[in-house]
Amino acid sequence: MNQRTVVLDRVMLASLVWGDVDDTDRPLAVLLHGFPDTAHTWRHLGPALAEAGYRVVAPFTRGYAPSAIPEDGSYHVPALMHDALALHQEYDGDDRAVLVGHDWGAITANGIAASAANPFRTVVAMAVPPLPTMYPRRGDVGRWLRILPRQAALSWYTLFNQLPRLPERSFDRLVAHLWRRWSPGYDPAEDLAHLAEALPDDEHKAAALGYYRAQSRRRQLPHPYRSLAADWLAEPEVPLLYLQGADDGALDPRWADRIGDRLPAGSVVAVIEGAGHFLQLERPDVVNARVLEFFGASR
């Protein structure tokens, strides 16, 4: 594992890399982390993909050190999509490239999967499915209503993170609580240490919280990202692998049961037993095998 830094047109991003990222004979794999997490979340999948012949780039997404806090202050999903697309270009990706995202990274990846600007062959989303697949539909409203109350209770933190100053002041306690609730039985000590390095002060913590706050301020989306604004709420157009932990404490696992027939042909949905929200860390053997199998089948 090494670290590479690139200056994109809107922000500087540092990434963990595996494999020879300058060897364009290898297909590119871009891995996007979520909240409250860092690029180190890919410490199992990254080496597995490199061993399978990929060159792997896992950025610390905007606002997470050592990446920069963006000057435009945007943490809107289209801005995150823009960064991932820019990484594909910066690292000379081609139509063999693949994209993997977890949590906010999954929201970003799902948006790219729905975009006409998508250069990736296929996409893996973990822990958050494409948002349109979660909407109610005819004949499914009853099941949707049965999931909704529990999901609303699980998602309390999304409203808490909208508050001014309080989330920053209680940030360390909040994220430790979320890790333990979202992935019961998993020891997050190493991941929380990485997170403390990535978000060392209130400015960086506000950046991480900005991902949530930006969604209630969509009219403030900077102009360079507006061409992607509708995509993250659209249905994916390329085959997608969706993975969710059976014990996920952030997103009710029952969502996985109702989305398969709303994904493009060639897509796969799998619930990982013995894993919660951070399934790539809890069951890396199973997750790595699922991802590699899907990438092989979609070639």
Residue ranges and their predicted role:
Residues 1, 10-13, 21, 28, ...:
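Flexible "cap/lid" subdomain of the alpha/beta-hydrolase fold that forms the substrate-access gate
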Residues 25-33:
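Short beta-strand element of the alpha/beta-hydrolase
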Residues 33-35, 101-102:
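Conserved alpha/beta-hydrolase "nucleophile elbow" surrounding the catalytic nucleophile
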Residues 36, 61-65, 130, 276-279:
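Alpha/beta-hydrolase active-site loop signature
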Residues 45-54:
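A short, Lys/Arg-enriched amphipathic alpha-helix followed by its capping loop at the start of a domain
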Residues 253, 262-277:
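Catalytic histidine neighborhood in serine/cysteine hydrolases
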